[in-house]
Curated annotation (Swiss-Prot):
GO terms for biological process: flavonoid biosynthetic process; polyketide biosynthetic process. Keywords: Acyltransferase, Flavonoid biosynthesis, Transferase. Pathway: Secondary metabolite biosynthesis; flavonoid biosynthesis. SUPFAM superfamilies: Thiolase-like. The keyword Transferase applies. It comes from the Eukaryota. It holds the Pfam family Chal_sti_synt_C. InterPro entries: Chalcone/stilbene_synt_C, Chalcone/stilbene_synt_N, Chalcone/stilbene_synthase_AS, Polyketide_synthase_type-III, Thiolase-like. This is Chalcone synthase 2. It comes from Daucus carota (Wild carrot). Its EC number is 2.3.1.74. The keyword Nuclease does not apply. Belongs to the thiolase-like superfamily. Chalcone/stilbene synthases family.
Length: 397
């Protein structure tokens, strides 16, 4: 028996990587249809036949002006909405029309982002051992993970994980899962794809549901992909960030703060409580738990990647923690250029940060700093906290 224990221990040792997980490449993609926030209220109320609701339109205009979003990308075009008028109503049976679109387009947009990440990574796609696919839309069987495997031509033996309808915190969830897979399977290379298309949540305005209108002012489409692995082969691979630790928590007294329900009318979105207040009130606890063991308590010494659920969340977190304005620069840039793309946002922000750090000649991929934090916020209220370590910035990234 003792002999077997030694053998098992040896097998376990061989199965595990030596070092921490690294993000080895990042790719992003958006649909070609770009909508400018300044023009959106007129378009939205016209296409949904709601121009008679002039007071509501004024409220929506103010929401769009306060959103800090300049433009967004959306797969659904005016042509699609004219062909599917039920999607434009606030509550009309429209799930089939929505599903038919997202089941095809979510994997397709994901493929575009994944292909860019694979190209940057530098290894053949046959070396991908695991796939994590995440989307808030389009439950189907076989899932978007299967469709992407086929579209990309990955090996049939790739180990797949499919995450549906987790919502806006899931960009942190996928990194947490990828870290565990990379560190516990020697040689593992995990392709992570978050692909989000708002066709499931788009709907016309309703006087009695202003929370739904908030979503219409914020949400955009986009896909992001990263490749995660431990013990990088430095002759080919160029690490961008190390994943040091990852945690998830449910905030106290936040039941029902953000809900989504899949119905015949599509995915309905409900914002029931003071979400920015709940997040800002609890965020320091998550920071202390994550950075206490490392001996860090100055939150301005970190580089920041925070899911931009909306400008009020970022404003209140900054205020509560006394963050300098530049801390959220990459986060606010992504919000301005793309809107809230749910799970994909934080991966877009990682991409923005490493690119800007190199362009501006910073010493590291993390805006010249060593340690950073990535936050996902979403339904629950659930918070994902990922501790990152940057690497020296070189032009080859």
């Amino acid at each position: 028996m003792a002999n077997h224990n030694a053998e098992i221990e040896e097998i376990r040792k061989r199965q595990r990587a030596q070092g921490p997980a690294n993000i080895l490449a990042i790719g992003t993609a958006t649909p070609s249809n770009c909508v400018y926030q300044a023009d959106y209220p007129d378009y939205y109320f016209r296409i949904t036949n709601s121009e008679h609701m002039s007071d509501l339109k004024l409220k929506f205009k103010r929401m769009c002006e306060k959103s800090m979003i300049r433009k967004r990308y959306m797969h659904i075009t005016e042509e699609y909405l004219k062909e599917n008028p039920n999607v434009c109503a606030y509550e009309a049976p429209s799930l089939d029309a929505r599903q038919d679109l997202v089941v095809v387009e979510v994997p397709r947009l994901g493929k575009e982002a994944a292909a860019k990440a694979i190209k940057e990574w530098g290894h053949p796609k046959s070396k991908i051992t695991h796939l994590i696919f995440c989307t808030t839309s389009g439950v189907d069987m076989p899932g978007a993970d299967y469709q992407l495997t086929k579209l990309l031509g990955l090996r049939p033996s790739v180990k797949r994980f499919m995450m549906y309808q987790q919502g806006c915190f899931a960009g942190g969830t996928v990194l947490r899962l990828a870290k565990d897979l990379a560190e516990n399977n020697t040689g593992a290379r995990v392709l992570v794809v978050c692909s989000e298309i708002t066709a499931v949540t788009f709907r016309g305005p309703s006087d009695s549901h202003l929370d739904s209108l908030v979503g219409q002012a914020l949400f955009g489409d986009g896909a992001a992909a990263v490749i995660v692995g431990s013990d990088p082969d430095l002759s080919v691979e160029r690490p961008l960030f190390q994943l040091i630790s990852a945690a998830q928590t449910i905030l106290p007294d936040s039941d029902g703060a953000i809900d989504g329900h899949l119905r015949e009318v599509g995915l309905t979105f409900h914002l029931l409580k003071d979400v920015p207040g709940l997040i800002s009130k609890n965020i320091e606890k998550s920071l202390k738990e994550a950075f206490g063991p490392i001996g860090i308590s100055d939150w301005n010494s970190l580089f920041w990647i925070a899911h931009p659920g909306g400008p009020a969340i970022l404003d209140q977190v900054e205020l509560k923690l006394g963050l300098k304005e530049e801390k959220m620069r990459a986060t606010r840039q992504v919000l301005s250029d793309y809107g809230n793309m749910s799970s994909a946002c934080v991966l877009f922000i990682l991409d923005e940060m490493r690119k800007k750090s190199i362009e501006e000649g910073k010493a590291t991929t993390g805006d010249g700093l060593d340690w950073g934090v990535l936050f996902g916020f979403g339904p629950g209220l659930t918070v994902e906290t990922v501790v990152l370590h940057s690497v020296p910035a070189t032009i080859t990234h």
